[in-house]
Structures are given as C-alpha cells and as structure tokens.
Amino acid sequence: AFCGSMKKVLLANYSHYYGGATGGQVQRYGNQGSTNDSYWKNVYNYAIFPVHFIQTQMENDEQYHNRVLIAKIWENYLFSQAVSIWGGIPKSQAFNAGERVPYDKESDIYYTMLNDLKACADGLKMDGDVYKADPIFPSGQKSSDLLKWKKFANSLRLRLAVRICNADRSKATEVIDELMENEQNLMTSNEDNCLLQWGDNADTRNYFYDYLVINRESNLDKLHSAGESILMYMAPY
C-alpha cells in the first residue's frame, strides 16, 4: 500500500500528460501541496508508526523476539522508501513527543538502516515465535515464514548498499561482498518475492478492488436508470 500510493500518483502524472487532461497540476508534473502533505502524513501516521509501536511495546518481551525483529525489518523498508523520495527526514527521533523534531542526514539514515537490517537478519531465530497470520511472507499455515523474512532483510540491505555506491563506494562494497558470500540468504526466485497477501473480505481485500469492482457494482442500478451506457465504463471514477 505504501509504495502503491506513490506509484499511483506517478502513473497519474503520466496518464494525464499522455491524455492531455486539463485542470489541476498533475498533468504538468507540478507539486500539489495536498497530495504531498497527505502522503507525508500517511507515511508516518499510518505506515511507520504502527510497526514502531510494536517494537516499543514488546521489545523487552522474549516471547515476541522474532515479531519485534520482523516489525523492525518492515519499518526499515518503509524508511528506505521515504528517504529515497525526500532525502533527509526525521528518523531517530521521529516518534518522540514534541513539535520540533530534528531531521536526520540522508547518509546517517542509510548507515542506520544497513546496521538495523543486519542485526535483524542475524537475530531471527528459525525456531522462535511468529505472527499467526503474516500478510507479507506467510508459510503454508499462514504464519510467518522466517527464512523469507531473513532473505528479505538481507536483500533490502543489498539494495540499499547498491543505492549508496556512488556516495560511499567503500561501505557499499563492504556490505555487498559480505552478503554475496552467503547468496542462499538472499531472495533468489519469485517464491521469495515480497507481496502483500490480500484477503477476501472488506477488512482484508485490496482497496483497489473495492474502488474498481465493488463500487462499480453498487452503482449498477443508478446507471440503468440514467440510461447512459458510457457511465457503465466510468462507474469506478
């Protein structure tokens, strides 16, 4: 959902530009304050804060050891997306109370993420606790597949190392060489892909399905009464 939201905005830019749409700024690749502000708020309030909260509440409880590490891996993934968009952002003190939250340097954020992901990958206990219903890497029993989480953490670390190679080649090379010594702990096939597993009810299904299918079906009676066939195709909008 996090990346999908930004991709939707970028694709909207392209489609509006290609179609010659008028009105607003999006087809001119302009910045829209409302879109940018809402995305920033959603990043912190609805994407990062929940997984950060898991860590602060459960980090000292050994029964939640793996689940805290999984939350930390996902938090670092979300921050990796945010820093790639905005550069320096609040991270180390992002969730401290107060109105004046300092921004971390972009380079410091990358170094912290690289260290965090290594600690998480190394710290996962393959025979330890799991989420009973894992929405990202479910096993056959729907609980967390810990090996896939380990591979994801290592692969994300590899991606971040490649991303900083022009800024700090020495650090990037160090991380890449280390990871390539154990390629079996990296994502190696489509089976390892990081995909959100959607459900089949209103609480768990893809929101685009609701938008494009459910909303359309709920408007069918109104479309028939309007007598305009073109509205059938415009229903989701």
Regions found by a protein language model. Give the residues of each.
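Structured, solvent-exposed acidic/aromatic patches
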Residues: 18-74, 78-237
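Extreme N-terminal leader/anchor segments
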Residues: 1-24, 56
